[in-house]
Each structure stands twice: as structure tokens, then as C-alpha cells.
UniProtKB/Swiss-Prot annotation:
Residues 139-148 have a biased composition (Basic and acidic residues). The gene is ylbB. SMART domains: CBS. Residues 8-68, 74-130 form the CBS domain. Residues 127-148 are annotated as: Disordered. It comes from Bacillus subtilis (strain 168). This is Uncharacterized protein YlbB. InterPro entries: CBS_dom, CBS_dom_sf, Diverse_CBS-Domain.
Amino acid sequence: MTKIKDLMTADLQYCTVLDNVYEAAVKMKDANVGAIPVVDEDGETLVGIVTDRDLVLRGIAIKKPNSQKITDAMTEKPVSVEEDASVDEVLHLMASHQLRRIPVTKNKKLTGIVTLGDLSLSEQTNERAGSALSDISEGDNREEGFFH
């Protein structure tokens, strides 16, 4: 059975709680990604995630300065999965929470991120990823303040 650690992106950009929204935006631009995990000061423990949408809605659109703390814009306690999670478990979480990406951890330490794109590239999971995308795209059931 394929585990998420076999499909995730392990070499990823991340922010720490000491970063500001400008630094997050630059890292996202440089990596060409729409979201970036946020780790604690230890540089390992996942504490949040920030998306390009978060930066707009919680920063730019309300005229916050670029020096705004990343912790003011991020989603705290994001949905995440352990490395040994199954593809079905991740697809279920993506569909039920309307997420296109989920941080991957091992004992709460960030080890990677898995995206719907990662799952669609695998022959074993392509069809199921398409089904999850359909579920994600059907309406927007996100809670206010839950933007990734």
C-alpha cells in the first residue's frame, strides 16, 4: 500500500513563527507555491500554514503592513497527516476539509507536504485524486477563517 511519505514533497520551503508576511510572500514566490507551512522557533514543529489567500484576506486587503507577523495571517493548527497515512485517508481529508494541500509530519515535526497534484501524478492514485478534486470543487463549505 502506498504511503504518503512516498508521494509527498520533502524538500520544501517553510516559515518560522519569527517571519513576517513579506518574508512568507517572497518564499512562496521563489518556490512558486500557493501555501507555505509555518513551524515553531525550533524549525521543526508544525504550528500553522499560510496561503496566498491568507496573505490577501488577513493582510493586504485590510491594509496591514508587510512587517505583520506571519502568526497573524496563518491558519493555526492546520489539518495535517503523519507520513504513514494512506492515500485514501489523505484524499478523504482533502475532500472533507476542501483542501488542495496538507502538511505531512512525523511526531508533529514537519517532514513534507502533499498536494492534490502530487496524488494526481501517481498512476495508482490519479483517478481517486480526480474524484477528490471534484468533491473539493463542489461548493465552498469552509469555515470563516479557514482558508487553505
